[in-house]
C-alpha cells in the first residue's frame, strides 16, 4: 500500500494514444476497467482531487509532528532503562521505530497531494517502500506481541526468556526481512510519472491492472487480516484463561496490550473495508460507475488518514494506560533537567507496587 493519492497505474505512450483516439479507458487516475471501458470516457476526478488537496496535506503534517514526538518519547523511555529489555518491550521498541519511519514519509506524500511529486523517481521508490515496510511491520509486530503473551500465559512457556535476547532479536529481524520482501514491488514498479490529463507528476505504480489488484490483496491479507486473526485468537484464549483463574494481577498486566490491539483494529478496519470494495470493483464483482468511484476515492483518503492516526495513538495509550510508562517518562525528564520534582517524589511508591508483578512472566509490559 502506498498513499492513495499515488496508488495508480501508469499508461504507456501507446495506451495514452489509444485513450485519446477512442475516448476509452477507465482510470482511477486511470485504471477503471469494466465491460464498458471501450464505449465510455474516463470518469472526472475533480471532486476527489480537490478533496485530497484540501484534506491530506494538513492531516499528514499534523500526524508527522505528533507521531515523531510521541514515538520518539516511547523509544527514549525504553532505551533509558538500565536493565535489559523484556521481549515485549523489545517488540514495542521496534514498533515505535516502525511508526516513526512511517510518519517520516508523510511530508513527502503531503507535497504530492497538495501540488505534485517533485522529488524524482529514486525518492519515489524509497519513500513508497519505506512506507510499506513500516506499515506491514506495525501489524506483524503487534501479532508477535500477542503470540508472546499467548505462550507466556496460556501455555506458561517463557519462549523469549530461555534465550534472551537472541530469539526476540531474530524474530524482529525476520519481521523486518518479510516486510522488505513485501515492499519489493515498490522498488521495482514505483516511479515519478507525468500525467498529461492531470498536468501533474505523481509517484505512481507502473504495472498492469492485475498487478494492482494482487498488491491490494496482499496488503489486505498480510497487512491486516492475518495479524488481526492472530491477535484475536491469542487474546481470546488469554482472556479465557485469566477469567477462569481469576488472575486479577494478570488482567491488569494485559490491559495496555489489549487496548493497543483494539486501537489497531478500530483504526485500520474502515480503510481495509474500503480496499475490499475497491478490489471487488476491480474484479467485476461490484459494478463500477463514476459516482461510486468518486465515493470510494474520498473514502480511501478519509479512512487511510484514520489508519495513519494509529502511529500517533500508541504513545498516547502508553501515557494514559501504562502506569510504569508515566513513571519512567517522569524519571527521564528529571534526568534531562525537568524542574518539577514535586510530582516525581510521589512516583516510587507506585513503582514498588507494580514491580512485584511487572518483572515476572505475568506482565505484559515490564517497561510500560
UniProtKB/Swiss-Prot annotation:
Effect annotated for changing residue 197 to A: Abolishes binding to CXCL10 and CXCL11 and CXCL9-, CXCL10- and CXCL11-induced chemotaxis. Reduces ligand-induced receptor internalization
Phenotype for residue 293 to A: Reduces binding to CXCL10 and CXCL9- and CXCL11-induced chemotaxis. Abolishes binding to CXCL11 and CXCL10-induced chemotaxis
PROSITE patterns referenced in this protein's UniProt entry, alphabetically: G_PROTEIN_RECEP_F1_1 (PS00237), G_PROTEIN_RECEP_F1_2 (PS50262)
Keywords on record: Angiogenesis, Apoptosis, Cell membrane, Chemotaxis, Disulfide bond, G-protein coupled receptor, Glycoprotein, Membrane, Receptor, Sulfation, Transducer, Transmembrane, Transmembrane helix
Effect ascribed to mutating residue 112 to K: Abolishes binding to CXCL10 and CXCL11 and CXCL10- and CXCL11-induced chemotaxis. Reduces CXCL9-induced chemotaxis
Disordered, as annotated region: 342-368
Protein's GO biological process: adenylate cyclase-activating G protein-coupled receptor signaling pathway; angiogenesis; apoptotic process; calcium-mediated signaling; cell adhesion; cell chemotaxis; cell surface receptor signaling pathway; chemotaxis
GO MF terms, alphabetically ordered: C-C chemokine binding; C-C chemokine receptor activity; C-X-C chemokine binding; C-X-C chemokine receptor activity; chemokine binding; chemokine receptor activity; signaling receptor activity
UniProt-reported outcome of changing residue 4 to K: Does not affect binding to CXCL9, CXCL10 and CXCL11 or activation
Highest taxon of source: Eukaryota
Topological region Extracellular: 1-53, 111-125, 190-212, 278-298
Impact reported for residue 278 to K: Abolishes binding to CXCL10 and CXCL11 and CXCL9-, CXCL10- and CXCL11-induced chemotaxis
Sulfotyrosine, modified sites: 27, 29
Comp. bias regions, Low complexity: 357-368
Tissue: Isoform 1 and isoform 2 are mainly expressed in heart, kidney, liver and skeletal muscle. Isoform 1 is also expressed in placenta. Isoform 2 is expressed in endothelial cells. Expressed in T-cells (at protein level).
Keyword Transferase annotated: no
Subunit structure as annotated in this protein's UniProt entry: Homomer. Forms heteromers with ACKR4.
Similarity-based family: Belongs to the G-protein coupled receptor 1 family.
The protein, known as: C-X-C chemokine receptor type 3
